């Protein structure tokens, strides 16, 4: 799924929760997609050659930053995925929507 589509879907869900204004929701969605894409890139590097200590710290920092943005936006993290063939971050959306073969249990993926 294209990032702009992911951003639009996330922005709509964040705004529907009511904790953020539409503008803040759009900013949160863009930041989440950007962070998740960076995390996915590190997953690709880890798969191909392994991560350096610096890259490991960056991965941890990205995961922490994603959790902060999710909490601020009112969304719930399902899990982080380290397999670079799929999405890097899976969320539990309020209506149970999903966009992967894992179904509702897996959640809605971003960051590919």
Locate the predicted segments by residue.
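Intrinsically disordered, low-complexity linker/tail regions enriched in Pro/Ser/Thr
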Residues: 2-3
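Short, charge/polar-rich alpha-helical segments
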Residues: 9-36
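Acidic, low-complexity, intrinsically disordered interaction modules
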Residues: 33-50, 54-110
């Amino acid at each position: 799924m294209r990032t702009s589509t992911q951003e639009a879907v996330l922005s709509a869900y964040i705004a529907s929760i009511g904790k953020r204004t539409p503008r803040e929701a759009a900013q949160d969605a863009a930041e989440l997609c950007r962070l998740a894409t960076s995390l996915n890139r590190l997953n690709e590097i880890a798969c191909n050659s392994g991560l350096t200590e610096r890259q490991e710290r960056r991965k941890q920092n990205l995961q922490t930053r994603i959790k902060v943005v999710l909490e601020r936006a009112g969304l719930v993290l399902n899990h982080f995925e380290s397999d670079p063939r799929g999405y890097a971050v899976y969320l539990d959306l309020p209506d149970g929507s999903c966009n992967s073969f894992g179904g509702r249990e897996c959640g809605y993926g971003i960051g590919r």
